[in-house]
Amino acid sequence: MAEEFVTLKDVGMDFTLGDWEQLGLEQGDTFWDTALDNCQDLFLLDPPRPNLTSHPDGSEDLEPLAGGSPEATSPDVTETKNSPLMEDFFEEGFSQEIIEMLSKDGFWNSNFGEACIEDTWLDSLLGDPESLLRSDIATNGESPTECKSHELKRGLSPVSTVSTGEDSMVHNVSEKTLTPAKSKEYRGEFFSYSDHSQQDSVQEGEKPYQCSECGKSFSGSYRLTQHWITHTREKPTVHQECEQGFDRNASLSVYPKTHTGYKFYVCNEYGTTFSQSTYLWHQKTHTGEKPCKSQDSDHPPSHDTQPGEHQKTHTDSKSYNCNECGKAFTRIFHLTRHQKIHTRKRYECSKCQATFNLRKHLIQHQKTHAAKTTSECQECGKIFRHSSLLIEHQALHAGEEPYKCNERGKSFRHNSTLKIHQRVHSGEKPYKCSECGKAFHRHTHLNEHRRIHTGYRPHKCQECVRSFSRPSHLMRHQAIHTAEKPYSCAECKETFSDNNRLVQHQKMHTVKTPYECQECGERFICGSTLKCHESVHAREKQGFFVSGKILDQNPEQKEKCFKCNKCEKTFSCSKYLTQHERIHTRGVKPFECDQCGKAFGQSTRLIHHQRIHSRVRLYKWGEQGKAISSASLIKLQSFHTKEHPFKCNECGKTFSHSAHLSKHQLIHAGENPFKCSKCDRVFTQRNYLVQHERTHARKKPLVCNECGKTFRQSSCLSKHQRIHSGEKPYVCDYCGKAFGLSAELVRHQRIHTGEKPYVCQECGKAFTQSSCLSIHRRVHTGEKPYRCGECGKAFAQKANLTQHQRIHTGEKPYSCNVCGKAFVLSAHLNQHLRVHTQETLYQCQRCQKAFRCHSSLSRHQRVHNKQQYCL
């Protein structure tokens, strides 16, 4: 039976833009992938040769494609170039000769043609340009005229012949018999030569072609031919017209253009040949010229990029948006590739079931199964595909760090790590945030910083709802749930949950000082301390004066090189001087918030305050759907849903931990084992004693100028000063009432909203504050932890105990300004003041008689009740 050949154009399916629009996304993707598989099978049988065309009988000369001659451009090519889909491929930098080759044969308009323009095929095609130029033409001393009439073979040759000029050396590589295969894909039939055995062997990782020089194996005959040239280092293919040598026949197939009218240009510097457009771009590398210079940067666009495309990098024009996640792209090709993540159309490995979004990633992964891993580490037994990776891995065992920094002498294993480290010394921060303008040394740091603006926290804790922007923060948080402390100190056996804390702790035992001063030889534990010390020598060289004397002449103040301009006090570090200067500038608040107008004395406090306005609140709580942050959500959920399995037998109070129950039982036992050595005050818990002892030991350097009260923290002083100044920066949006503290405003707003988040589990009563709920629970439990030391009477609230103790002491702190009468309670004073003001707030509804206090009204109403009872 005679073999019948069918061209691709006969079996191809033509689709218009209207046909593609009718196909859905899922059907279109299925059609695309199936067509791609068929197309790749065809190209395995007969790789494309875009540079030369010939008839099978060899009667006609080779014709240059449209890429080299304008006369050869067909109408199909022109029509294809103008299509919208082709514009995307030209923007991607695809070879014009490839597209025109496909269009000329009617290949682009078929379903197989479109399928070929895909990531995997084009990446392999463009990544190895010489793969397009491989030819089976053997040049055994033939003239250039004879070169043009060579026959392009339509099948795979059973013998691969390589000629080396005068001394020819032939490698015979046997290939398996080609058998015709019939396919019925896409409602069409076609015959093609396919080597199923060879294809299966490549998939299984077999490499049947072996080099006789070094024994290296290859999966294809042409790869063996290319490898064999590396042994001879000769150029076996010689062009007879100019006697110029080439490494491959493919290079020779391109070179005749210089003799047949095609204009190729040779670089005088390197001797490399180029086409006209490529030669112009190459010359600019020598002259330093940067055409098409962007107004936004000093970098010219690459030669394969149009100026319009280069401007998109500065204008940030991203007109293609993803409907799933809202991410924007500059090209529709990037959007299509991104959408595969949402559709979950994944490619699975048949051996290890690993999945990938792109086919090319699957092919790269399959090479790990097929490749012969001959490089093995003798230390740990790890296997590598390449010897270079093994050498790099062995440096870890040997501790080698060949790349050294010239500034500090620090060494690194990789050159890329050294370059990133050198940016610390040069101050280069190429990665800049578009939101706030902050710059970073590394791109990964910029990505982590952007999550502050977007609120994106991909790393979630499985135990609670808390999420984190960095995996290291998640690991540190998970140690709270597991209570695991895997890092142990070898000296004292103390354990830590974080490796950083262990490193800091070990410095206490070793007392190593790795940082040494080059001037005086003094060593330090921290690098920051060394920098602070080096500034002393820098000031000495500049002749810095303190109180009219040079530092060298005053050894006591040698390291106090930072001087206050107001009181002339000196300090050893700049941070100490900054803290000291706040004493002189106290009350001055130059940093003002743009949102609410609040002013601060320090820039760091302003930044911390601005987070209140820019805070992302992604969670809702309560029936009204109030927006809260993740931290607030955790506190609310832990309060309402936390289990309390440990119950007190005395009062019935429950606890989440047994340690809390043990501490609580000390209240009923009356034990106060922790006693202060200075004031004999006792406490039930050790942490309370530690906090109390700080009141004796710690100084209070911050003094209020109005009343002389001292404070330990500036924030406490600022809150206290609002009492004297009457400042109330927090204003209620409902009624306009102002408050001095933000916590007071939050509690007040619950009156308007009616929110009562704290609910009693016993009776269901709700409260606006957690402290009110705690006091209310004592009604059910009968707990009265506050006991009077004089009479032994117990109270549920501390305020009640304070009022009761005034009976024993006779203290009456509330006095009337009119008559001077004193009272124990402020409520009694308010009632007394109504005597002077004649104010009557409580009125009887029956006789309209008014009273100053509610108790008098209640006694009066009993009169009406008795009269009604008598009637």
UniProtKB/Swiss-Prot annotation:
Pfam family, any one: KRAB
Protein task: Involved in histone 3'-end pre-mRNA processing by associating with U7 snRNP and interacting with SLBP/pre-mRNA complex. Increases histone 3'-end pre-mRNA processing but has no effect on U7 snRNP levels, when overexpressed. Required for cell cycle progression from G1 to S phases.
Family named by the database record: Belongs to the krueppel C2H2-type zinc-finger protein family.
Domain commentary: The C2H2-type zinc finger 2 to 6 are necessary and sufficient for discrete Cajal bodies localization. The C2H2-type zinc finger 5 to 10 are necessary and sufficient for interaction with LSM11. The C2H2-type zinc finger 2 to 8 are necessary for interaction with the SLBP/RNA complex in the histone pre-mRNAs. The C2H2-type zinc finger 2 to 10 confer activity in histone pre-mRNA processing.
Gene name as annotated: ZNF473
Zinc finger (C2H2-type): 209-231, 265-286, 320-342, 347-369, 375-397, 403-425, 431-453, 459-481, 487-509, 515-537, 562-584, 591-613, 646-668, 674-696, 702-724, 730-752, 758-780, 786-808, 814-836, 842-864
Keyword tags: DNA-binding, Isopeptide bond, Metal-binding, Nucleus, Repeat, Ubl conjugation, Zinc, Zinc-finger
Major site of localization recorded for this protein: nucleus
GO cellular component: Cajal body; nucleoplasm; nucleus
Location of cross-link Glycyl lysine isopeptide (Lys-Gly) (interchain with G-Cter in SUMO2): 148, 419, 549, 558, 635
Polar residues composition-biased segments: 71-81
Keyword Amino-acid biosynthesis among record annotations: no
Nucleus is among the record's keywords: yes
Residue stretches making up the KRAB domain: 6-75
Domain of life: Eukaryota
Listed Basic and acidic residues bias regions: 145-154, 290-317
GO molecular function terms noted in the UniProt entry: DNA binding; zinc ion binding
Location within or outside the cell: Nucleus
Protein name per its UniProtKB record: Zinc finger protein 473
Subunit structure: Interacts with the SLBP/pre-mRNA complex but not with SLBP alone. Interacts with LSM11 in a U7 snRNP-dependent manner.
Region (Interaction with SLBP/pre-mRNA complex): 312-552
InterPro entries: KRAB (IPR001909), KRAB_dom_sf (IPR036051), Znf_C2H2_sf (IPR036236), Znf_C2H2_type (IPR013087)
Location of the region described as Disordered in the Swiss-Prot/TrEMBL record: 47-81, 140-164, 290-318
GO BP of this protein: mRNA 3'-end processing by stem-loop binding and cleavage; regulation of transcription by RNA polymerase II
